[in-house]
Regions:
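Short, surface-exposed patches at the edges or C-terminal ends of soluble domains, predominantly
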Residues: 1-205
Length: 205
């Protein structure tokens, strides 16, 4: 998803989206890495039944006049970074000199590119060891921060392609089980629409 944003023909446009940062920090370097791997695009596979991921890549590249040799194989990419948690979407990896890395994502909305809020949040994760941690209580029928159902909270908490999700706004997320003590690093505890009462032991926690 979002693959057009990083295509060689669109690279200048892509870089211009970050001019407000590179103008004042010209030492910022952008490296583009092209790869192919398993896609979440079911329509892509339905239109190319019987073809492997590599064969689909070759077919699409030839149609667009792109060099098929510029794409890393899945195993080659994994030697650099594992993007399986990102569903192999186009993503930026911000990296400091000390090797610390953070993802800066594209989003499934009309703007697509990260805005100032998302860029600032990503940069803060690079330099700040004390990010705010939001804990979500588990059990007791509470709304689930990992599921995407009508009563659950995945989209606003940790849906990676949703711009306003907490993980894209500089927050760390942690599930909390009151059978154990609440971790000290949790700054905010969310108890979302609890259906059953807490036990005396959990109340103590």
């Amino acid at each position: 998803e979002f693959s057009w944003t990083g295509e060689p023909a669109n690279r200048l446009y892509d870089q211009r989206r970050f001019e407000q940062y590179t103008r004042f920090k010209p030492e910022i370097k952008m490296k583009y890495v092209y790869f192919y791997d398993k896609s979440q695009n079911e329509r892509l596979y339905s239109l190319n039944q019987g073809l492997t991921d590599r064969e689909i890549m070759i077919k699409l590249s030839v149609a667009q006049g792109l060099d098929t040799n510029m794409y890393l194989r899945p195993e080659e990419l994994k030697q650099i970074i594992d993007l399986s948690s990102e569903d192999n979407h186009v993503v930026r990896v911000l990296e400091r000199e000390n090797g610390r890395k953070v993802f800066l994502r594209m989003f499934r909305d009309m703007w697509i590119y990260p805005g100032e809020a998302e860029v600032t949040a990503a940069i803060r994760q690079l330099v700040d060891d004390d990010l705010p941690v939001v804990g979500f209580l588990t059990g007791h029928g509470v709304r689930n921060s990992e599921k995407a159902g009508d009563r659950d909270y995945r989209y606003f908490v940790q849906e990676r392609v949703y711009r306003r999700a907490l993980i894209n706004q500089g927050f760390a997320i942690k599930n909390v089980n009151l059978d154990d003590e609440i971790p000290e690093q949790v700054n905010i505890l969310v108890i979302a629409d609890m259906q059953t009462a807490l036990s005396p032991g959990e109340m103590e926690s």
